[in-house]
């Protein structure tokens, strides 16, 4: 490709509304342009990267035995009503009616459509297992689209759905998809972790997320410094303290704390170690509970894990924090003065809190706290559960090493769905025993557009994008200096351009009448891995300057050797 016949569209300045580096660089490198909130046009450079990501995904899905299909973006509402998600899904589901007043949705996902297809096409266990995939546009009406294509409303996704007559069969496919995803992200040159995850609104049993490590990530991922253990922080178990609870050394004392409504204020004003404080959070109780509220207690320096808390039998789902009005109606004190002593509602404490002694907590009286509280002396030990987020340095749940925490961008997610959708849509086949058998499902997603942004978040420097070779828009950039004034520069550039293309190498030759500084800046911004610079001065010695984008290393290579050198560097 020649720049004179190409839409380069690079920008010198960073757009003001671009928050994260991937959004900034995708705009500056001429990869995307915003059409409306959360909607982007992919320009040629961006589309080349997107297609490479898509091709790697497709190759590995085919290698894993999945079958490609294509399902409509527009879906009839009756399928969503049949599955129950018409009512469950929030405003992210874009609903509309056609000219005949028939309701439809723009698909955010395709569980209903594929299950409908299978229930009409399959009739016998002999046809299973099957794993269908597509690479298709999705639409989710995000309340606040941000970070460019990282969280856009319209996006490209690879979604796959497998169907089985046994859990063993599902597990085999699940393991195959796990391995395929690992190959996909490895081939793309990404630093990623596969982590245990919560199944969330999708439902089902087992679940793993594939997270690309990046400081801009929205998820905290946890992994052992010794073993292969890794999990989303939502799911990571906080191990109970291994040392026994220390004996009481203080008497419980009621203390006036009128200006201490938070743990931070309590610690600062009374010079308390934060590890000796407890915070109390009140949430709505489950419908079948005798109480309207439940008290959850975590250590002052720990954070409540809302996913864990929501799964407790006494707690309402979704987790809902009580308002101050609701708290005062039950406790007669504000949220800054709550604690376990004389608490009139059910109390659940974290494992770490259960191991505490001589601690401070609210007295359930405005402006007062108890200091020197001890379990079983001042208040009975209540229900104990793992309800906090782990912190760096905690022991790994598998007993090997300690935990590290890094930020991650979720680019893939696999689920064992079980029978949630097949039961709702009555998808069954005749089993081996002749009886009707509801199908067991798995689903497996990759955010194809998000992968592009995540790759940039991991691969950039002060000059621009530093693409992994496998997904770069071009493999080689040819920069002929003053080619319009030097016949030998132009002649060699054209010769190398033809020879490299004949070797199947993707080349961008900058044949613009531009200053060298502009040409260098654009190629580094775009992030092409290999650059060759052809200039009269080096040609006097029969040399070409070669530069590898990732290392920045430059070297002089003889003109007769450069093609073989590049072929070897690119193809191995």
From Swiss-Prot:
Keywords recorded for this protein, A-Z: Aminoacyl-tRNA synthetase, ATP-binding, Cytoplasm, Ligase, Nucleotide-binding, Protein biosynthesis
Could you tell me which PROSITE patterns the record lists for this protein?
Answer: AA_TRNA_LIGASE_II
Give the function comment from the record. Answer: Catalyzes the attachment of proline to tRNA(Pro) in a two-step reaction: proline is first activated by ATP to form Pro-AMP and then transferred to the acceptor end of tRNA(Pro). As ProRS can inadvertently accommodate and process non-cognate amino acids such as alanine and cysteine, to avoid such errors it has two additional distinct editing activities against alanine. One activity is designated as 'pretransfer' editing and involves the tRNA(Pro)-independent hydrolysis of activated Ala-AMP.
Enzyme category, top tier:
ligase
Tell me the HAMAP family matching this sequence: Pro_tRNA_synth_type1 (MF_01569)
State the EC number(s): 6.1.1.15
The UniProt gene name for this protein comes to proS
Q: Where in the cell is it found?
A: Cytoplasm
Name the principal localization, coarsely classed.
Answer: cytoplasm
Q: Which GO terms describe its cellular component?
A: cytosol
- Source species: Salmonella paratyphi C (strain RKS4594)
Choose any GO biological process term that the UniProt entry carries and state it: prolyl-tRNA aminoacylation
Q: What is known of its domains?
A: Consists of three domains: the N-terminal catalytic domain, the editing domain and the C-terminal anticodon-binding domain.
Family annotation (SUPFAM superfamilies): Class II aaRS ABD-related, Class II aaRS and biotin synthetases, YbaK/ProRS associated domain
Swiss-Prot/TrEMBL catalytic activity: tRNA(Pro) + L-proline + ATP = L-prolyl-tRNA(Pro) + AMP + diphosphate
Which NCBIfam families does the record cross-reference, listed alphabetically? Answer: PRK09194.1, proS_fam_II
What the record says about family reads: Belongs to the class-II aminoacyl-tRNA synthetase family. ProS type 1 subfamily.
What is the protein's name according to its record? Proline--tRNA ligase
Quaternary structure, per UniProt, is: Homodimer.
Q: Which GO terms describe its molecular function?
A: aminoacyl-tRNA deacylase activity; ATP binding; proline-tRNA ligase activity
């Amino acid at each position: 490709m020649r720049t004179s016949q190409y839409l380069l569209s690079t920008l010198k300045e960073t757009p003001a509304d671009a928050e994260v580096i991937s959004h900034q660089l995708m705009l500056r490198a001429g990869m995307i342009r915003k059409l409306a909130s959360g909607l982007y046009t992919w320009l040629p450079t961006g589309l080349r990267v997107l297609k490479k990501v898509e091709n790697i995904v497709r190759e590995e899905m085919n290698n894993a035995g999945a079958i490609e299909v294509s399902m409509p973006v527009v879906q009839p509402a009756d399928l969503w009503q049949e599955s129950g998600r018409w009512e469950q899904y929030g405003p992210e589901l874009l609903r509309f009616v056609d000219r005949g007043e028939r309701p439809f949705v723009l698909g955010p996902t395709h569980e209903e459509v594929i299950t409908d297809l299978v229930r009409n096409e399959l009739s016998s266990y002999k046809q299973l297992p099957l794993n269908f995939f597509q690479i298709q546009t999705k639409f989710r009406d995000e309340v606040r689209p941000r970070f460019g294509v990282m969280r856009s409303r319209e996006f490209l996704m690879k979604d796959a759905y497998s169907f089985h007559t046994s859990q063993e069969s599902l597990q085999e496919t699940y393991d195959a998809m796990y391995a395929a995803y690992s190959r996909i992200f490895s081939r793309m040159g990404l630093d990623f972790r596969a982590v245990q995850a919560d199944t969330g609104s999708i439902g089902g049993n087992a679940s793993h997320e594939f997270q690309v490590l990046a400081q801009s990530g929205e998820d905290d991922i946890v992994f052992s410094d010794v073993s292969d253990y890794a999990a989303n922080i939502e799911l990571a178990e906080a191990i109970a303290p291994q040392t026994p609870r220390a004996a009481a050394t203080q008497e419980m004392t009621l203390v006036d704390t009128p200006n201490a409504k938070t743990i931070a204020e309590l610690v600062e004003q009374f010079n308390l170690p934060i590890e000796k404080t407890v915070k109390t959070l009140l949430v709505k109780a489950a419908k079948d509970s005798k109480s309207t509220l439940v008290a959850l207690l975590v250590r002052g320096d720990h954070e409540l894990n809302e996913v864990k808390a929501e799964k407790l039998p006494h707690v309402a789902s979704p987790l809902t924090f009580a308002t101050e009005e609701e708290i005062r109606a039950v406790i007669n004190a504000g949220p800054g003065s709550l604690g376990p002593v004389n608490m009139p509602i059910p109390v659940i404490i974290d494992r770490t809190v259960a191991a505490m002694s001589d601690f401070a907590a609210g007295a359930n009286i405005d402006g007062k706290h108890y200091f020197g509280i001890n379990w079983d002396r001042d208040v009975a030990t209540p229900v104990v559960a793992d309800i906090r987020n782990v912190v760096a340095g905690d022991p790994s749940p598998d007993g090997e090493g300690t935990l590290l925490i890094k930020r991650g961008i979720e680019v893939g997610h696999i689920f064992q769905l079980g029978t949630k959708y097949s039961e709702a849509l009555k998808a069954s086949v005749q089993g081996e025993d002749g009886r009707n058998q509801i199908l067991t499902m798995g689903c497996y997603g990759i955010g194809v557009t998000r992968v592009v942004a995540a790759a940039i978040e991991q691969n950039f420097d002060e000059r621009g994008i530093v693409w992994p070779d496998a997904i770069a828009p071009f493999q080689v950039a040819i920069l002929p200096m003053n080619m319009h004034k030097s016949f030998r520069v132009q002649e060699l550039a054209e010769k190398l351009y033809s020879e490299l293309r004949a070797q199947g190498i993707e080349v961008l030759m900058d044949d613009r009448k531009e200053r060298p500084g502009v040409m260098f800046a654009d190629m580094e911004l775009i992030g092409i891995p290999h650059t060759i610079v052809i200039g009269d001065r080096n040609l006097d010695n029969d040399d070409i300057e070669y530069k590898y984008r990732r290392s920045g290393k430059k070297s002089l290579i003889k003109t007769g050797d450069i093609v073989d050198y590049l072929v070897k560097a690119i193809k191995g």
